[in-house]
Amino acid sequence: QWTKILTGFVEERTSIGVFPDGALIVAGNTVLSYSEDGGSTWEFVSLDMFYDVRNLSVVGDSSVYMITSGNMLWKTSDRFATMNYYSVGFPGVIALYAIDFPTLDTGYIAGGEKTVFKSVDGGITWDTILHEATGGVFYDIHFFDNNHGITSDSEGSFRITYDGGESWVNVMSPFTNPINDIEFITDSIGYASTSSGEICKTSDQGENWVSILSGSGSTKAVCFANEQEGFITNDFGFYYYTIDSGHTWSYDFSGVEFGEEVLDIQFAEGYYYASCTNGDIFKIDDLYIPVTIFSQQQNDFHLFPNPATDFVHVQFAENTSGQLINIYDSFGHLVINQQALPNNVISVDNLPSGLYVCELTDYNGQTSAITTFTISR
């Protein structure tokens, strides 16, 4: 169940951080919000600047490091009782996208032009340790300790360092599209999301990656509560959810306002917390899994054109008989229900533009395949 937390936010919230005791930090635009009671009450912290917070890193019991669109680093060591800021790189030249401090003194920032910055004095000064200058972007970064880390780029590959950024190894993923987010739930196991809807997984600290789900749209924020259970958000408020370490996935609508997107999601004290483009914050519990996606069955389930205008073709294996085609809108309403044939042409000219879910089920309601598509006119 997705429950909206009443915060008074009216602007985009890009990042969520969690202290070890479960206290929440939600940042975006020029205001930071802080809650010590699971989102029931909030304290607003003005950053006194004109730049948006893009990403943050929580370290220890009291410290937070935040990067902004103006190439500034904001730092607190006492839970926002005091704040300091420092310059990183060159504003307007290399944008900052992700930050990770494995310890209080050592931190890394990933950014545009495939650049990585490093600080060894708690964020006061920064050195450029990787700059490929190819026009691409490093979208996310994660360090296991002060020396061993990984960053993801806009061409579907990773860079790994074992010596604090002195040298880097290029690691390819199964994809060629931007890798939006990476999260490691143990020292070895991690997941990554892509702008083309795929999800990939590693079991060896990012040295090798395998595709575990080919979805649609763009998968974004990754968050796992433990090795078995986790979220990966998708376009237009939809999300994927697994309870078996990514072997199977559910696909459902989150309940955010139509057209809004979930930008970040974090787990704390038994709940997931999600931040949205319109400033809404959701607290998530008692998850219901309506359908399960089996990737091997999806291989024979195709829908085109995508985006659609007036009709869609739905194709699946000819030996699939006695099936139904269900199409749902982004609010979860069933808008089309009909018998499935191996090659269906379905009229959608009476449906408005937007994101839709198409599933193939038997007469008992068991889902055998599912995909998404958009209608655009």
Residue ranges of model-derived segments:
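Conserved Ser/Thr-centered positions that define the repeating blades of beta-propeller domains
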Residues: 35-36, 76-77, 119-120, 161-162, ...
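Residue-level detector of Asp-centered blade-edge/turn motifs that repeat once per structural unit
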Residues: 18-21, 58-61, 101-104, 143-146, ...
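C-terminal outer-membrane/trafficking sorting elements
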Residues: 296-304, 308-377
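Blade-level signature of beta-propeller repeat domains, shared across WD40, Kelch, NHL, RCC1
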Residues: 261-289
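Trp- and S/T/G-rich repeat-edge/linker motifs of beta-rich repeat architectures
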Residues: 1-9, 40-48, 81-91, 124-133, ...
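Repeated scaffold domains used in trafficking and secretory/extracellular systems
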Residues: 12-16, 52-57, 94-100, 137-142, ...
